[in-house]
Amino acid sequence: MARKTPLKRYRNIGIVAHVDAGKTTTTERVLFYTGLSHKVGEVHDGAATMDWMEQEQERGITITSAATTCFWQGMNKQFDEHRINIIDTPGHVDFTIEVERSLRVLDGAVVVLCGSSGVQPQTETVWRQANKYEVPRMVFVNKMDRAGADYFMVLDQLKQKLGANTVPIQINWGAEDDFKGVIDLIQMKGILWDEANHGMNYELVEIPDELKESAAKYREQMVEAAAEASEELMDKYLEEGDLSEADIKAGLRRRTLDNEIVLVTCGSAFKNKGVQAVLDGVIEYMPSPTEVKAIEGELDDKDGTIATREADDSAPFAALAFKIATDPFVGTLTFIRVYSGVLKSGDSIFNSVKSKKERVGRIVQMHSNSREEIKEVYAGDIAACIGLKDVTTGDTLCDLNDKIILERMEFPDPVISVAVEPKSKPDQEKMGTALGKLAQEDPSFRVKTDEETGQTIISGMGELHLDIIVDRLRREFKVDANIGKPQVAYRETIRASVEQEGKFVRQSGGRGQYGHVLLRIEPLTAEDKGEDEDMTFKFASEIVGGVVPKEYVPAVEKGAYEQLQNGVIAGYPMIDVKVTLFDGSYHDVDSNETAFKVASSMAIKEGAPKAKAVLLEPVMKVEVVTPEEFMGDVMGDLNRRRGLVQGMDDSPSGKIIRATVPLAEMFGYATDLRSQTQGRASYTMEFADYEEAPSSVVEAVINQNG
């Protein structure tokens, strides 16, 4: 079966937004218009359309489906049919890892902002991640019909807060209750969508007099931005004073793909205005898989040679598993982005991260209103595989004879843990299975059993993250469980440097044990870390002349690392420690790896307490958006929680307070903030760093851990 859509007509995009910017409605409208345009013959009247949308909402596809495939030919059927794969991204900061993972497999992104609240703290986080992966993006300013909507304020915020080089290709026609449509600056016409049939039709009209001046000003800026794409366009612009429609679009496209500019459009998804033009923009200005940088990976050789995989069907198969979802009907769905080659159902492939062979059962593609089983997928495709056994998020799937690891995904360590206990015996068995499935789906969520108490402990990125896990246990897996008090993931470190001997000798007839090391234990510096900011442990060997044979050095490192997982103050893992093996001795017969591992752990156990060990606590970056009249209460409360206010900004809904607060003080904050501000304030929180805990906290932690 040959490829239906040529690769240059593919668009893999994400719709990214802050929680309340209207992403779900925007996505729903995208599915609505594309679903209709693809099956336009089947819809004879409005009723069928709306039924389909309600059913869609009941099934909640925009929330649960990790990737949806739809088709679009343009508002005026002016394009050949393009295939748009939409990858869903969550809006809440507890799921930042999910956003980052989805940005990894996108080629372009549409960032949805609210016309009245503008750039929110979360938007900044997502924008930073999109910069990191160099994702070309365009912005849709939504909710232009809302009270307080101000398109030009949002444009200003994009520049000020995100440093975005924005180029509006539309301006709004009216706002709030008077929002009528948009002015298209390329055609220099007004666009009015037909409200009677949900915006399926539109008309181009002359620009009203009161907007002519503003439209001319922004058009000039847009044409200049397009002209800067090349010398040829600039010469043409300087000669003629304007550019043709085709030249403007070509210039804007080129600069968008090079991440030099961000195009901005506006509308109201709820009122069926503007989303249709966003879809046209995706085709005209977002990249196809062949227009982005070829993905890099490590070859399966000893040197970890870097290789690239071009978006090409004839190249060896390589794909990234970017999300695992549990489906009540088919079991585990593994969503993959195919970067190169072709995969057929029934094929055997290799999971290069886990070094395991896998067989693909079935392959399905999610469409806006159905699930289609397909026989094969090609480079650039996004689909879900059924039947993969040991694949987790971030794994690479590749050709058995051409192995490559596309990336080693770094997942942050959880910062909060709670104990969960099933309410009944039948729940016990179901809970184990359910938690296993949820952990497979989400690598930033961990499950373990406490060896001393036998309790099941779940850990995640924040209170909301764990609340949602518990909610899913109840809703999807029908498991009722009680939740314990949240526990904080403390760490320990050292502030001084010591040298410590470790000697393990056992001689009792026959073969004995002999390991002897001298270790330098010292704080890990920024210089030691170099570019790897996330490094928490470093081992070095200064052994010369073989006083400790080379083959035992890895055992010394292992012994040191494992012992550092049991801190000296309250048993928490020790981080930011550098251990150097600088001397030792061995025995020809009695020395072995185990003896050196034990000697090394003895040296750490004795040496670490002498190196001025301290307890570290996770500190969170907190942003609170509050009406001005509650500012005093909110600030006072943050101070009581040992918070340090870093600064304040104005926002349309009051003030934004930026602070750092220890996680231990943030439990239950959502409820407290609601009652202090009559439910009018909101906050976001993300992990910032580990900092030394004050003595009162250290005492409490030691007493709690007995």
Swiss-Prot record:
Residues 8-290 form the tr-type G domain. The keyword Transmembrane does not apply. The keyword Nucleotide-binding applies. GTP binds at residues 17-24, 88-92, 142-145. Keywords: Cytoplasm, Elongation factor, GTP-binding, Nucleotide-binding, Protein biosynthesis. PANTHER family: RIBOSOME-RELEASING FACTOR 2, MITOCHONDRIAL, TRANSLATION ELONGATION FACTOR G-RELATED. Gene3D superfamilies: 3.30.230.10, 3.30.70.240, Elongation Factor G (Translational Gtpase), domain 3, P-loop containing nucleotide triphosphate hydrolases, Translation factors. Pfam families: EFG_C (PF00679), EFG_III (PF14492), EFG_IV (PF03764), GTP_EFTU (PF00009), GTP_EFTU_D2 (PF03144). GO terms for cellular component: cytoplasm. Its main location: cytoplasm. Belongs to the TRAFAC class translation factor GTPase superfamily. Classic translation factor GTPase family. EF-G/EF-2 subfamily. HAMAP family: EF_G_EF_2_B (MF_00054_B). GO terms for biological process: ribosome disassembly. It comes from the Bacteria. It is found in: Cytoplasm. SUPFAM superfamilies: EF-G C-terminal domain-like, P-loop containing nucleoside triphosphate hydrolases, Ribosomal protein S5 domain 2-like, Translation proteins. Catalyzes the GTP-dependent ribosomal translocation step during translation elongation. During this step, the ribosome changes from the pre-translocational (PRE) to the post-translocational (POST) state as the newly formed A-site-bound peptidyl-tRNA and P-site-bound deacylated tRNA move to the P and E sites, respectively. Catalyzes the coordinated movement of the two tRNA molecules, the mRNA and conformational changes in the ribosome. InterPro entries: EFG_II, EFG_III, EFG_III/V, EFG_IV, EFG_V, EFG_V-like, EFTu-like_2, G_TR_CS. SMART domains: EFG_C (SM00838), EFG_IV (SM00889). This is Elongation factor G.
